[in-house]
């Protein structure tokens, strides 16, 4: 197979939606928990390992704020990013987590920036934070079938979704 040198490589950044509080995270990890909580707790593990790293530019942003999402898209565009790939937590049977930032982008049309989804296709357990070696199921990933597909039909309408051609 001969490579097609006319194809352009496109850079699409993963967009992780953990940077805003949710009732589930409040219940499981404590009031106000976001991924920033873990960033702030980071400890150096070896000589020269600078931790915690304080976020530059946008600081400890909150994804509930439209101006944060706009600033992220502006910055991404400035540095050659062509779209965001939102990490999508769909657990089946109508249950989603961390959907607010993406839903607000979809409903408002802002920021006007191409997007796609990546299904975070796994259960959530507390094992990564549990120090006793056990684990507890927080949210089980289910596969009801057609519902998985049907839950996404509404996002195929916008013209902003990143297209691969």
Task: Identify what each model region corresponds to.
Residues 3-71:
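N-terminal regions that are enriched for targeting/export leaders
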Residues 153-165:
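Single conserved hydrophobic/aromatic residue that forms the stacking wall/gate
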Residues 68-87, 91-117:
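Aromatic-lined substrate-binding rim segments of carbohydrate-active enzymes
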Residues 103-124, 133-152, 156:
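Acidic, His- and aromatic-enriched active-site or binding-groove loops in soluble protein domains
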Residues 23-26, 96-98, 127-129:
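Short, solvent-exposed loop/turn and secondary-structure capping segments
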Residues 28-30, 100-102, 131-134:
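Short secondary-structure boundary/capping segments
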Residues 52-65, 82-93, 135-149:
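The substrate-binding groove and active-site-proximal loops of carbohydrate-active enzymes
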Residues 16-18, 89, 118-124:
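Active-site beta-loop-alpha junctions enriched in small/polar residues
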């Amino acid at each position: 197979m001969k490579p097609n040198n006319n194809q352009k490589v496109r850079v699409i950044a993963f967009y992780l939606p953990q940077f805003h509080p949710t009732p589930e995270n409040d219940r499981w990890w404590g009031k106000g928990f976001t991924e920033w909580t873990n960033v702030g707790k980071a400890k150096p593990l070896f000589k020269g390992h600078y931790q915690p790293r304080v976020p530059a530019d946008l600081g400890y942003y909150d994804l509930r704020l439209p101006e944060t999402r706009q600033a992220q898209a502006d910055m991404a565009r400035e540095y050659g990013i062509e779209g965001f790939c939102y990490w999508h937590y769909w657990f089946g049977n109508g249950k989603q987590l961390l959907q607010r930032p993406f839903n607000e982008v979809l409903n408002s049309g802002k920021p006007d920036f191409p997007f796609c989804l990546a299904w975070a296709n796994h259960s959530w357990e507390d094992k990564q934070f549990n120090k006793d070696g056990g684990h507890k199921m927080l949210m089980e990933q289910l596969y009801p079938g057609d519902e998985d597909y049907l839950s996404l039909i509404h996002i195929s309408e916008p013209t902003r979704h990143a297209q691969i051609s």
